[in-house]
């Protein structure tokens, strides 16, 4: 079911902020935050997708119930998994050589999917936090994607933004690699992995800043 203007927030005054308004504003604020270090498009894309999972009737009903003062358990309607699944299904390779596009997809999936709480990409038992989010049922994924692409941004624009993000992330990885050029392979790999972890937190921080400020 496709209905225009899905709500992202309903204020105490009754004013509605739509998912389109909120995602675009969050994206702009996140992009502005990371513009000085050349990650504008990466931050923009993560912000644009972070609330993809709100574009469904179940979330509309949840927000409207809360606005009326009805009993509505905060966080009871999952909206954070959808962006992770979309990003990984469309831009992450399921097999073969792991390259910068895969790194970019995982960074964006984490930044968009962890804006309400961190999750382990790899758990203590080697389980994947990404896989859990990709395979979770009953979250209205197809409905959310259909409505988000109609209301917020089309698929071709998302694909273009992702390719620009890959170029940005590749440039950062190249700079990190240059900094470790004098290290042994083992030490260099450790340093690169550490700095990519910092990059993940930086992108997430930009999305959270945009989300909270908007």
Q: Over which residues does each language-model region extend?
A:
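Accessory nucleic-acid engagement/destabilization modules that flank
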Residues: 2-214
